[in-house]
Amino acid sequence: MTISKKSYAKVNVFLKIVGIRDGYHLLASRFVRVKNLYDIVEFQSGSFDKFTLEGDFGCKTEQNTIYKAYIKLKEISSKVEEYFKAHKVIVNKVIPEFAGLGGGSSNCATFILMVNDVCSLNLSKDELSTIGATIGADVPFFIYEYDSANVSGIGEIVKKFDEEPLDINTYTPKIACNTGDIFKSFRSSFYKECSQNEVEKLFSTKSIDIYNNMDIKSANDLYEPALSLNKDLNPKSLNLDIKSFFSGSGSSFFTILKN
């Protein structure tokens, strides 16, 4: 028997830095799920001596967000460990990794939601989000399964944003972006804090209007530091004819249309 669930990508329509707390950058961002780009997480029955995770990942199992979630969840209930003696996890990967699209965080959240269901943990979305936040900053957004949300703090504060469905197309060039290096560059050469008034204005504006009225640099505070580290992260260099925005710390670009 196999059960499965889609694990969607996300884009950041805007990403603004509002301050620093305990060494972490505080952000204000609009996260939007990309409905046409997703991995599939499956639980497949069998007999296994240990937790088994299969998929085309760019890291060891012990470093994978799904494995980290398993370790957290089995501390909550013995049912989790028992379940994965009789099931393995398979992830059919489509979302590019390390691309600013939240693939690892989405996989983690999808796994948590599925385990909460199949093991009858009966944990609320808020409780699941708290667990997810200890694994990755973007995990809480995916736990809530909102199509659009305003996200703040280090990613743990997620508030649903109601807007019409959006048609989002992504493009991920074969360019590696190191998130740590990009934040270092931002801090040393591009540091600025978005005002609370500006954040409130952005949080109340529809994504399509932000896309139509802002440009790639003003929408994402991490784009210029990313570009300073890799000059090829330029829509013109990549032959992107349509107006494109930059997601997270890259390297993915995206366009938005009304659905």
Model-derived features with residue positions:
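Short beta-strand scaffold segments in enzyme catalytic cores
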Residues: 15, 39-43, 138-143, 149-150, ...
